[in-house]
Amino acid sequence: MATAAMLCAARALRPRSWIPGTCQAQVRHTHQRASLLSFWELIPMRAEPLRKKKKVDPRKDQAAKDRLKKRIRKLERASQELVPIEDFITPVRFLDKSRQRPQEEHSFEESERRALLLKRWALYKQQEHEMERDAIRAMLEAQQEALEQLKLESTELYAEAIKRDTSLFPFEKEGPHYTPPVPNYQAPEGRYNDITKVYTQVEFKR
């Protein structure tokens, strides 16, 4: 049984031979996708269970609505001063659309070289994507074959093998980082000068 499992695992990890010159179907945006062997975090995994709705007393609900209506009437009677929203006011110096840095002009040879480099990179990522996909498919087939052989040997071991592993979650992973860490980096203390203007709302009584 152990020999059969080792043979299946070795066959799964065997690299797929790629013959140069074969026709490769193009996959759009393959070079921008994550690796198939990486851990994909889905939206339902980041969700939380629904909270149980609490029973609301109708009298408390009606009292809260009455207080809100009273507050609205009080605000309607008093004419309040409008506070300017500075976050939506664009400074005049940012409205100048003149470009400060001149655009760099590339020669025809440089443009062709960059286009060819991008195509080669896309082809490389496509081949890497296909190799990872085939490796995953082979590992799944080998796992299924090993489980079938284990089921023939012992049903108890098969039940233990397909049991859910509770130690896998919560899953923690660090990286990959876009840039390497800076050695001996001293983080700033976080001091800043708050220049936010504070407005006082004045109520006028009639």
From Swiss-Prot:
GO terms for cellular component: mitochondrial large ribosomal subunit; mitochondrial ribosome; mitochondrion. Its main location: mitochondrion. Gene3D superfamilies: 6.10.250.3440. Residues 1-46 form a transit peptide. Pfam families: MRP-L28. Residues 170-190 are annotated as: Disordered. Keywords: Mitochondrion, Ribonucleoprotein, Ribosomal protein, Transit peptide. It is found in: Mitochondrion. InterPro entries: Ribosomal_mL40, Ribosomal_mL40_metazoa/plant. Signal peptide: none annotated. The keyword Hydrolase does not apply. Belongs to the mitochondrion-specific ribosomal protein mL40 family. Component of the mitochondrial ribosome large subunit (39S) which comprises a 16S rRNA and about 50 distinct proteins. This is Large ribosomal subunit protein mL40. The lineage of its organism: Eukaryota, Metazoa, Chordata, Craniata, Vertebrata.
